[in-house]
From Swiss-Prot:
Residues 126-156 are annotated as: Disordered. The modification Phosphoserine is found at S36. The keyword Hydrolase does not apply. Its EC number is 2.3.2.27. Interacts with NOS1 and NOS3. Interacts with PP2A holoenzyme, containing PPP2CA, PPP2CB, PPP2R1A and PPP2R2A subunits. It comes from the Eukaryota. Coiled coil: none annotated. It comes from Bos taurus. This is Nitric oxide synthase-interacting protein. It catalyses: S-ubiquitinyl-[E2 ubiquitin-conjugating enzyme]-L-cysteine + [acceptor protein]-L-lysine = [E2 ubiquitin-conjugating enzyme]-L-cysteine + N(6)-ubiquitinyl-[acceptor protein]-L-lysine.
Length: 302
């Protein structure tokens, strides 16, 4: 007996494992992967730097950012929009000049043709026995040079580009730029974002005697500002806009929504002032966070 049946290539069926392995190695098809806990950021980490925030701010949609990182992002986006707008205006001006040049050349050709016809001594009389198409305005004098009544294939061959003839060499046209949007968008939600929309966030540390460096090494760093419950990715929490305090959603539903008063500053609250913080998830499917990452790549179709 040989060991042919023990080899991984001896099977007559293309297995799912072999298909996934070949797809990953080929560079084609959409790749899917299930994210684990190690690939999920903590609730108090910046969405850009993925590091614990020193001066956190939150957007109206609940995405947490480091103030320095998000302001640098907004500044970079404004510079990029200005650069794209400058390139768009430059191309637009070049197209206008090109159109004017073509109109000017067409007008000069029209004048030149009129002067040549007027200066000619001998002109052929119009033939009244011409086809309808010619009597509609296309006389023998208006016929294009080199055109014939031959088959359509010959005319098509004449219109084909020729790389060895300078006059028939195809021209590579520049890509037409679309007018860029002047609105800076949030890198996570894609919605419009302004500096005035950012709300400062004040986390309540678990132990006020421990400095920031010591808090980073702990798994439980912050607590609810009202109930003193521990905050983590497994605890849904919200930010109160007037004070910036972080509280649990359970505290919001059971205590704060009854009077709609900020427990820290005493100011009146509205539904817009309660910002639900976007958590990173726990790695479990029941955490309510999408834990499936996809990467779209070219697809080969038969």
């Amino acid at each position: 007996m040989t060991r042919h049946g023990k080899n991984c290539t001896a099977g007559a069926v293309y297995t799912y494992h072999e298909k996934k392995k070949d797809t990953a190695a080929s560079g084609y098809g959409t790749q899917n992967i299930r994210l684990s806990r190690d690939a999920v950021k903590d609730f108090d980490c910046c969405c850009l730097s993925l590091q614990p925030c020193h001066d956190p701010v939150v957007t109206p949609d609940g995405y947490l950012y480091e103030r320095e990182a998000i302001l640098e992002y907004i500044l970079h986006q404004k510079k990029e929009i200005a650069r794209q707008m400058k390139a768009y205006e430059k191309q637009r001006g070049a197209r206008r000049e090109e159109q004017k040049e073509l109109q000017r050349a067409a007008a000069q050709d029209h004048v030149r043709g009129f002067l040549e016809k007027e200066a000619a001594i001998v002109s052929r009389p119009l033939n009244p026995f011409t086809p309808k198409a010619a009597s509609a305005g296309n006389g023998p004098d208006d016929a294009q040079p080199g055109s014939s009544a031959g088959p359509a294939g010959k005319d098509k061959d004449k219109a084909l580009p020729s790389f060895w003839i300078p006059s028939l060499t195809p021209e590579a046209k520049a890509t037409k730029l679309e007018k860029p949007s002047r609105i800076v968008t949030c890198p996570m939600s894609g919605k419009p974002l302004r500096m005035s929309d950012l709300t400062p966030v004040r986390f309540t540390p678990l132990d006020s005697s421990v400095d920031r460096v010591g808090l980073i090494t702990r798994s439980e760093r912050y607590v609810c500002a009202v109930t003193r419950d521990s905050l983590s990715n497994a605890t849904p929490c919200a930010v109160l806009r007037p004070s910036g305090a972080v509280v649990t959603l359970e505290c919001v539903e059971k205590l704060i929504r009854k009077d709609m008063v900020d427990p820290v500053t005493g100011e009146k609250l509205t539904d817009r002032d309660i910002i639900v913080l976007q958590r990173g998830g726990t790695g479990f499917a029941g955490s309510g966070v999408k834990l499936q990452a996809e990467k779209s790549r070219p697809v080969m179709q038969a």
